[in-house]
Amino acid sequence: MLNIMEVHETNKMIEQEKLDVRTITMGISLLDCAADSVDEVCENIYNKITTYAKDLVSTGRAIERDFGIPIVNKRITVTPISLVGASSCKSSEDFVKIAHALDRAAKKVGVDLIGGYSALVSKSMTPAEEMLIRSLPQALSETDIVCSSVNVGSTKTGIDMNSVELLGHIVKDIAHATADNDSYGCVKFVAFCNAPDDNPFMAGGFHGVTEGDAVINVGVSGPGVVSRALDEAKGKDFEFLCETIKRTAFKITRVGQLVAQEASRRLGIPFGIIDLSLAPTPAVGDSVGEVLEKIGLEQVGAPGTTAALAMLNDQVKKGGIMASSYVGGLSGAFIPVSEDKNMIDAANNGCLKIEKLEAMTCVCSVGLDMIAIPGDTTAATISGIIADEAAIGMVNQKTTAVRVIPVEGKGVGEMANFGGLMGYAPIIPVNQTSCEAFVTRGGRIPAPIHSFKN
């Protein structure tokens, strides 16, 4: 039974501590939309999305109103489009037509973002997957809310270096195609290793082929709540600190579980998972960086940052997993530089560098996220960054990702502004020493020895 103190506590978390449900995401399978012609595929996709998701936004708003819980985004994920369009798409331009169909359908139902313009190439690329990847600069520059991801590796299969090398050039081309908007197209693209099938967050969300016809996944967010709770832990030992984070994560996740079950009931679509992630925003007091600083760092990036983040990530999972019947997605603490006020400040004064961020990705929820880098960064350097991050994920059996923005026409110290939840970021330096001879070797990096578990 709920008591009145718990009700007041939850209300305080929402009103004063910026607790929100970051997203209700509906996953929709498009496997049955495949057809002989691209136009027919586009029509099938449009019809299925607008049928299944027609009430998603209104239901989200009704739940907000009925329970008083802010739901920031309503989103859709779909089956990786490289699979759906494989039989009908004969060129990159054909895939771009599907991107436009996704954009139109998502706008019709009123969602904020749609993810799944994706390819899974952890071992090698099919012709269709390569065409989709080559279509990304045009697709992401011509659409508004379509998000894309490419899974380039996994612990079981290794890393496909052919796709990694290609993606360095593609990221540069996306940046060029959207140069008039601080290369915003790169915000909508992420390269993954060990990508999950049920991620409700963007830009990496897609509806995996292991999923059913439709599902509701929910991502929660509460770094501000954790930050306020840590005020009570000042000067206390690690046991008290960990217990405080765990208890707070439990409360945050219960809110997400309530919203997920209610959305599932009202929409008549099965509940999938809760993603336990702490997802920051650029607003003051809604920062993962602030949480790390309250744990005891002068500023994010100081020695000890990786250890503090490892502890935070683990306690969030331990607390949250007891609050939901199904946990999945990425689940942990996000470190997106442009979306986190304290990380923006740390990057601005040189305390937080890309090398430290890479170390932090060994223990955080995902990887190098929302990092603005100089526009003259080479394609090979970007491929090298993706390869490094994929290797961390492959060897450590975790999800890792890269979402870097080489801001065309800007250099170190200048500011890139992406707007809204995406925030803003100082452009930070990247080691420009060449790795071209490495990333252009061709072939794939084999899976690690500990992947052989049969």
UniProtKB/Swiss-Prot annotation:
Q: Name one Pfam family in it.
A: DUF711
Name the InterPro entries for this protein.
UPF0210
Which domain of life, per UniProt? Bacteria
UniProt xrefs under SUPFAM superfamilies: PFL-like glycyl radical enzymes
Q: Which PANTHER family match?
A: UPF0210 PROTEIN MJ1665 (PTHR37560:SF1), UPF0210 PROTEIN SPR0218 (PTHR37560)
Q: Give the family this protein belongs to, as stated in its UniProt record.
A: Belongs to the UPF0210 family.
Q: Which HAMAP family match?
A: UPF0210
The subunit structure is:
Homodimer.
What is this protein identified as?
UPF0210 protein BAD_1323
